[in-house]
Amino acid sequence: MKYYKTKIKRIFDKENKVLGHANGEFVPNGRFYFDRIRKDEIIEDAPVFDYFHLQSFDKRKFWEWRLQDVHGFIGIFPMFCIWYISDKLKSLLEKFRIAPKYHFYETRLLYKEEKFKYWIFQFPIGGFHNYNYEKSEYFIDNERILGIKTAEEYDEYDYKIWKETKKNIEWRKIVLIDKFDIVDTWQGDILCSERLKQAIEENGIVGFEFFEIDYEVVAE
């Protein structure tokens, strides 16, 4: 399965504008719920979070200049959630094997005095446990790192290396235990399978950019 790095399109040079992102500062009890989501809790009985609004670092009059199927977050929101998505995109994602664990939270987005149904996409939860660390290939100073078996061991080693040397571990091959259409990586990339990328483009989903990656990703 081929993967692409995917990013939210945020900067528009031709229009000289930046994308507005979702701020949940007006959601009742939002901080309480968002903190629980931040800690990877799945809240099955969460209320509809009403409402978010778009905001950017540009002038206020440009906050709502563009609406996409995917936005990021700003201000008050559940930390570590990175996609705020339209109902159309949610329906598409549900047709795929998204991630080992994930959840959608229904919200309302106030946009140009009208409310739209948007969703907080809580993902991936525990995605790094889907890695085979013994078969994956990652290096420091061109020397392959061996002996790591779990996500916790890798995280501890990564922190130690950064603290002592300020160097990043270089990944050359990710081996996944199971196949999913969205993969998070230790280097910060969010990967999208070729078939999901194709479906996004064919269904006119607006807001993503896709890039080739310079490392290998395989599933056992």
Predicted feature descriptions by range:
Residues 1-220:
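Phosphate/anion-contacting hairpin/loop surfaces
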